Amino acid sequence: PSKAAENLKSKVASIAKSTLDLMSKTDLIEDKQKKVSSKTVTTSDGTIVHDFVDKSNIKDIKTIGTIGDSVARGSHAKTNFTEMLGKKLKAKTTNLARGGATMATVPIGTDKTENSIYRQAEQIRGDLIIVQGTDDDWLHGYWQGVPIGDSKIDLKTFYGAFCSAINVIKENNPQAKILVMTATRQCPMDGTKIRRKDTDKNKLGLTLEDYVNAQVLACSELDVPVYDAYHTDYFKPYNPAFRKSSMPDGLHPNERGHEVIMYELIKNYYQFYG
């Protein structure tokens, strides 16, 4: 054969080898992607999320304890995220959340009765503890508001009560995994009238976001994972379509909203605990 033909044959062989090498590398990359990828799920409200349960040790959770306010309790929802997660993991659940609960140990209402998430934290037990909320410190005393504070042990402040709640949970449940969830954005409605907005300031000059930001920063100091439900794109209470689908009163997620919350909590668990 001619020299040109030999060169062509050599080039073809070289290209074939390169193609096989590339295919082999592609197969390796795809295998790695399969190992780290999660199952894509479309929730009942059309939200596309990822389900990490099969890849996470969350499957080993046998008992779940939840504390928080009316959102965690499941107000205006047929079922809540704790019940959904318990069913998915086949785990027993305890939900101590109460409507109107503040983080701080401050008196509420005319009878000055305390209704705090900190007290719930003293009682809760479980392999997985979920701490949700809250907007009620922002709204306390008809918007008088609870100070955010800067002491980790001052139970009369939002920050101090939250830090103390996490610490008492750790003391009572030394092997437990902890997940935190902030308040969502809100636009409570009375028909077509907006009752309030999360951007409104209380008498301390604080918005709901101020409390959320303090809580998120505290989670870094406490080394616990947090689902920042305020800054997520999944909850849009100012959008009438979203409200009609997943948050009818502009404040409390219905069961469709709780389904999204469940998957976001699972994701945060997987990212932090594996």
Regions found by a protein language model. Name each.
Residues 173-177:
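A short helix->loop->beta-strand "cap" motif at the edges of active sites that frequently abuts
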Residues 162-166, 212:
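Generic structural signal for well-ordered alpha-helices
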Residues 183-274:
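Catalytic His-Asp segment of secreted/periplasmic serine-dependent ester chemistry enzymes
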Residues 61-66, 71-160:
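Conserved SGNH/GDSL esterase-like catalytic core that processes O-acyl groups on lipids
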Residues 132, 179-181:
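Conserved, well-ordered alpha-helix/loop/beta-strand core segments that scaffold catalytic motifs
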Residues 85-86, 169, 218-219:
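A generic structural signal for well-ordered alpha-helical segments
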Residues 1-67, 71-77, 87-88, 123-124, ...:
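N-terminal secretory targeting modules
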